[in-house]
Swiss-Prot record:
Molecular function in Gene Ontology: ATP binding; ATP hydrolysis activity; ATPase-coupled monoatomic cation transmembrane transporter activity; metal ion binding; P-type ion transporter activity; protein transporter activity
Known catalytic reactions: ATP + H2O = ADP + phosphate + H(+)
Principal location listed in the UniProt entry: endoplasmic reticulum
Gene designation per UniProt: catp-8
NCBIfam families referenced in this protein's UniProt entry, alphabetically: ATPase_P-type (TIGR01494), P-ATPase-V (TIGR01657)
Protein name as it appears in the record: Probable manganese-transporting ATPase catp-8
Highest taxon of source: Eukaryota
Annotated PROSITE patterns: ATPASE_E1_E2
Record organism: Caenorhabditis elegans
Function of the protein: Mediates manganese transport into the endoplasmic reticulum. The ATPase activity is required for cellular manganese homeostasis.
CDD domains named in the record: P-type_ATPase_cation
Extracellular topological domain residue ranges: 38-43, 208-211, 415-428, 991-997, 1057-1076, 1131-1147
Length: 1178
């Protein structure tokens, strides 16, 4: 049964006792049968090794079954549990989450009894699910908030303590406690992962082959890597835990009295009093603001540095149903945010709660992990384990390699079994080693490093990611969608002027020349609020108020400039109907006192989309449509204004009237024309994205004509093709495409069914869809929409839900989508896109960062000079807690500076200054740790800067990660295939490597494996796009053909080695390793082939640094290659003795070097040739 966005399915189970686990009877019977066969049919003494091998095989299979129970929840449930139809008699439930929301878990079903009623519940990812008898399904018990506003306005909280207990019992308290597991617990969890278990199994096999050094070296490397990851995971979890709210006391209304309780004791339904508190005091949970407006810093949740204004619902229509989706932005204070300013509520209306301390009155609607902050914490917390590559592709690729390994192992077993004297135990061991060789120990480490390197690189660029598994998707992106306002254009809007009725000479560009009515609308119709010395609110409204020169005071009064004409008085705002994306307008009821009278004249001021206000005017200007259409075609944002004087009324009566009563019989007050300049680098970045083979589209809530103008400027649409707009017709029936200039009119769908003619229709026009047209196509012409949507470059007048639907439609067509928005209106689209990037509005961050860096450098320089003068460093160099900046100062310390005698009094001032500098630098280093505000609830990727250059960075890193993964698979596959041959055919010739040789080989190639994942992307995106997956003609062909070349080289060189090997002693596989010409030849050429594989298959440009630019990788290949050449040429005799090698004959040595050179050249030609023909080269 589907439950919610987090949980897909819940299946009830009962745990079986160990004796009744389904795997116990089969293995008991198999073990008994094998014992009988071995002892009574084969014979104990004659087939001792065979008997032990049988037991070993049974034990390994049993261990695998148990591990599969641990790894795979369906297997565990099938073998260890019995399914229950009735959840009420179940002991556990198997919880399967929705895609990308964690992993399945078998959780205990809890039972809590109260008042003779039993509550069935369980906890999954810190969310409580309770069994509901009526609906017969598990539900997250949250407060039902879909109630009329009057319910909340008249609420007085819990009047009886019993009701508090009931709410706590049903809905839970406000705890957001996170328990960080112990190191050992987390290490065991990682140590039972499939790859780790497999690697430990391989280490055991190598030990049986008497390769102790190599086995222990590999095991140490694996355990160190896993321990490092566990430590990092624990650190991350500790930081997440610290992000939770710190406890403090809060005023709550219970039993008709105000009392102080801890924030953890709050329950949904409480009434609280909250205001600006201490620095560390965050809002404890999600609150509905009942009385008293406030300004909130939401940067901890959204990352936005601009404070948000929150309005109380005390003046909202009583019958309006509260919708948490649409009303939360204006009326809900989210948990984890901070109130930076609040206004004491006014006189309480009848039935409303009075504030005990002048703070805001709020209603608790969500607590604990059900809050927005709780959801973000869970996203980060349960996203820790997601830093992996495509597991399905990895598994399939290993299966592909396993085919070769099985063939090699079968060859060895058949050939080896011919000789009856050979040990079957040794033969079986060698066959097992061949099968395991196709999964290199480096694979999981490499895949983790590739993703983690990209994470770190993005962090340095100010881009933070909560879902690392999405990084490779960025390399596969087909279409990039952008919001317009605030994303492509700046927030620094410019008011061009006001166009009035029949204004033939253009628009009024000076506010002083405006009619009084137009000024009144501009000055009063806004949601701005004064915060300290700044205005907080919509950038468009700030631009309008600034342009007309009026000044907003703290009491919602707007005062004219001192230079204003006589007779113009200030305006007091009494009631606001805030702007919403759905209604596309804002209405304000305000009042002013005419000169010489104390009576208040009330006015209604309305501002919004011209097409929405069109039917609200008492007298519509004749050129209304023509004027706003002409202005929007020029790329300007146009808002219509209307005003109406109200008759005599009282302030109290205003609140009782509905919005519709005010929005009619308006007088036209003009069109305010606003230009939205493009960001300085938007054109350059869009060109780079388009030049890198991506389709681009704009999804905006703005006017279609304005959006089409911007799309033409940015070359989303071609100037040579007409842009057709589909908008709602006047009759609502005849849907027609109309060109922006009005010269072309075409039917909705091309009448022809001929594919070529339809293709010509789509290719000869550019398309723009409006929100109403999109709604029509979704519900009436969905087949045509799927055909059309990939050709639409502009989506205008789109509501947030429609933006989300567009992304889902594109994904359903198999397109990998990227959405870039501002993180507020675009949350749904950002979440549903394969790659969602939220740009935060922090225009001064870059400058501040540069200033801080400058200050830091100055401090380091001052510290260095103090050290040179003899001041003593407060911490030893290289200490675990020492910041890099402190270490920079230490580098210039004179010898013995740390261990000097106590300083003379005259040096105390310098010493104190140095100590302070070091403390400041250390604090700065600590401040760079990621905080909750760095991540956003809006999107998987959050950029701290407003530039869409972030999109290019994300795509570059995505491509780099994809290509790195692909080249790693190629290299590891080739090495595994060569290894499989060496272990099979050559094993029968007596070829084996010593423990020392295997260890040295591992050490030499370890650096290559490390630096291959550290590749950095290029500074610009390439036109070519990387292949999206491992399984393609290029990869399979290049691996196969390169292996054939390697195989041929091995055969040729081994043949020469056999001829050069004068010692023709019979092969003794049990004998202790002794170096000879054959062993030495195979060891050197196998190492040489592996180095060649790295050199040939390193991808480099156009997606990442070339081999010559990646110095670390180049030097590691050169060092390994140099070591191989030295050994092959026989120049370092002592080194060869140390490596247990013999000096090769000159003819064999020369042949070997020539063969390796030929292998390198031929493999390079094969790889680049196939890439040119089948790959992503051109």
């Amino acid at each position: 049964m589907g439950v919610d966005q987090l949980v897909e399915t819940i299946i009830p189970y009962n745990l079986r006792s160990i004796a009744t686990h389904l795997y116990v009877p089969p293995f008991t019977i198999i073990t008994a049968i094998w014992t009988y066969v071995w002892l009574n049919i084969f014979g104990y003494e004659e087939y001792y090794e065979l008997g032990m091998l049988g037991y070993a095989a049974i034990f390994v299979i049993l261990a695998l079954v148990l591990l599969f129970c641990h790894w795979m929840m369906p297997v565990r449930c099938f073998l260890m549990c019995s399914k229950q139809e009735d959840v009420r008699i179940a002991s556990h439930v198997c919880v399967i989450p929705t895609q990308n929301n964690g992993w399945p878990e078998l959780v205990k079903l809890m039972r809590t009894t109260r008042d003779k009623q039993t509550k069935l519940w369980f906890e999954f990812q810190r969310v409580h699910y309770t069994w509901d008898e009526e609906s017969r399904e598990f539900q997250t018990k949250t407060l039902d908030t879909a109630k009329p506003m009057v319910f909340f306005q008249k609420s007085h909280g819990f009047e009886v303590e019993e009701h508090v207990k009931d709410a706590k019992y049903l809905l839970g308290d406000n705890k957001t406690e996170m328990i960080v597991p112990q190191f050992l617990e987390m290490f065991i969890e990682r140590a039972t992962a499939p790859f780790f278990v497999f690697q430990v199994f391989c280490v055991g096999l190598w030990c049986l082959e008497d390769m102790w050094y190599y086995s222990l070296f590999t095991l140490f490397m694996l355990m160190t890597f896993e321990a490092t990851l566990v430590k990092q995971q624990m650190k991350n979890m500790s930081e997440i835990r610290n992000m939770g709210n710190k406890t403090y006391m809060i005023n709550v209304l219970r039993g008709k009295k105000w009392q102080k309780i801890k924030i953890e004791e709050l329950v949904a339904g409480d009434i609280v009093s909250i205001g600006r508190g201490a620095e560390e005091e965050c809002v404890p949970c999600d609150l509905l603001l009942l009385r008293g407006p406030c300004i909130v810093d939401e940067s901890m949740l959204t990352g936005e540095s601009v404070p948000q204004m929150k309005e109380p619902i005390e003046d909202v229509e009583k019958d309006k149903i509260f919708d948490i989706e649409t009303d939360s932005r204006l009326h809900v204070i989210f948990g984890g945010t901070k109130i930076v300013q609040h206004t004491a509520p006014g006189k309480a209306a009848e039935g409303m709660v009075k504030s005990p301390d002048g703070n805001c009155i709020c209603y608790v609607i969500r607590t604990g992990f059900n809050t927005s902050q709780g959801k973000l914490l869970r996203t980060i917390m349960f996203g820790v384990k997601k830093a992996t590559a495509n597991n399905l592709e990895t598994f399939c690729f290993i299966l592909f390699l396993l085919i070769f390994a099985i063939a090699a192992a079968a060859y060895l077993w058949i050939k080896g079994s011919v000789d009856e004297t050979r040990s079957k135990y040794k033969l079986f061991l060698e066959c097992t080693l061949i099968l395991t060789s196709v999964i290199p120990p480096e694979l999981p480490i490499e895949l983790s490093l590739a993703v983690n390197s990209s994470l770190m690189a993005l962090q340095k660029l100010g881009i933070f990611c909560t879902e690392p598994f999405r990084i490779p998707f960025a390399g596969k992106v087909d279409i990039c969608c952008f919001d317009k306002t605030g994303t492509l254009t700046t927030d620094n809007l410019v008011v061009e002027g006001v166009a009035l009725n029949n204004q033939k000479e253009g628009m009024i560009r000076n506010a002083e020349d405006l009619p009084h009515e137009s000024l009144q609308v501009l000055a009063s119709c806004h949601s701005l609020v004064r915060f300290e010395e700044d205005l907080v609110g919509d950038p468009l409204e700030k631009a309008c108020l600034s342009w007309c020169g009026w000044n907003l005071t703290k009491g919602d009064a707007v005062m004219p400039p001192k230079t204003a004409a006589k007779g113009i008085s200030g305006i007091k705002i009494f009631h606001r109907y805030h702007f919403s994306s759905a209604m596309k307008r804002m209405t304000v009821v305000a009042g002013y006192q005419s000169p010489g009278t104390s009576d208040t004249t009330f006015i209604v001021a309305v501002k919004g989309a011209p097409e929405v206000l069109r039917n609200m005017y008492a007298d519509l200007p004749s050129d209304y449509d023509e004027t706003y259409t002409r202005l929007t075609r020029q790329g300007s944002r146009v808002l219509a204004m209307g005003i109406r004087k109200l008759g005599e009324t009282r302030v109290g009566e205003l609140r009782d009237k509905k919005r519709e009563n005010f929005e009619n019989d308006l007088a036209f007050a003009g069109f305010v024309v606003i230009s939205c300049p493009l960001k300085s680098d938007t054109k350059t970045m869009i060109r780079e994205i388009m030049d890198s083979s991506h389709v681009v589209a704009m999804i905006t809530g703005d006017n279609p004509l304005t959006a089409c103008h911007v799309s033409k400027v940015l070359k989303f649409t071609k100037k040579s093709l007409p842009t057709l707009v589909l908008d709602e017709p006047a009759d609502g029936v005849d849907w027609m495409w109309k060109s922006v200039d009005g010269t072309i009119e075409l039917p909705l769908k091309p009448e022809t069914k001929n594919k070529m003619e339809r293709k010509a229709f789509f290719n000869s026009h550019e398309f723009c869809l409006t929100g109403s047209a999109f709604h029509h196509l979704v519900h009436n012409e969905h087949t045509f929409l799927r055909e059309l949507i990939l050709h639409v470059k502009v989506f205008a007048r789109m509501a947030p839900k429609q933006k989300e639907r567009i992304i889902n439609e594109l994904k359903s067509l198999g397109k990998v989508t990227l959405m870039c928005g501002d993180g507020t209106n675009d949350v749904g689209a950002l979440k549903h896109a394969n790659v969602g990037v939220a740009l935060l509005t922090n225009p001064y961050d870059a400058e501040k960062a540069a200033e801080k860096e400058k200050e830091k450098k100055a401090k380091i320089e001052e510290a260095r000079s103090l050290v040179r003068s003899g001041a003593q460093l407060p911490q030893r160099p290289g200490a675990p807690g020492a910041p890099p900046a402190a270490n920079a100062a230490r580098r210039d310390a004179p010898p013995g500076a740390r261990a000097r005698a106590p300083l003379p009094p005259m040096a105390n001032a310098a010493q104190a200054r140095l100590d302070n500098l070091m403390k400041e630098l250390e604090e700065e280093e600590k401040a760079q740790v990621i905080k909750l505000g760095d991540a956003s609830i809006a999107a998987p990727f959050t950029s701290k800067y407003t530039s869409i250059a972030s999109i290019c960075h994300v795509i570059k890193q995505g491509r780099c990660t994809l290509v790195t993964t692909l080249q790693m698979f190629k290299i590891l596959a080739l090495n595994a295939l060569v290894s499989a041959y060496s272990l099979s055919a050559l094993y029968l010739d007596g070829v084996k490597f010593s423990d020392t040789q295997a260890t040295i080989q591992g050490l030499l190639l370890a650096a290559c494996f490390l630096f291959i994942s550290k590749s950095k992307p290029l500074k610009t995106l390439s036109r070519q796009r990387p292949m999206a997956n491992i399984f393609n003609a290029y990869t399979l062909l290049t691996v196969t053909l390169q292996f054939i070349v390697h195989f041929s080289c091995l055969l040729y060189i081994v043949g020469l080695a056999h001829e050069a090997n004068t010692e023709k002693a019979p092969v003794d596989l049990e004998a202790k390793f002794t170096p000879n010409i054959l062993n030495t030849t195979v060891y050197i050429i196998s190492m040489a082939l592996q180095v060649c594989t790295f050199a040939v298959n390193y991808r480099g440009r156009p997606f990442m640094e070339s081999l010559f630019e990646n110095k670390a990788m180049l030097y590691s290949i050169m060092f390994s290659g140099g070591a191989v050449f030295t050994l092959a040429s026989g120049q370092a005799t002592d080194l060869m003795i140390q490596f247990e090698l013999v000096v090769l004959p000159e003819a064999l040595r020369n042949a070997l070097l020539m063969c390796v050179t030929a292998d390198l050249v031929i493999c390079y030609i094969i790889d680049r040739g196939l890439n040119f023909l089948l790959g992503d080269m051109f």
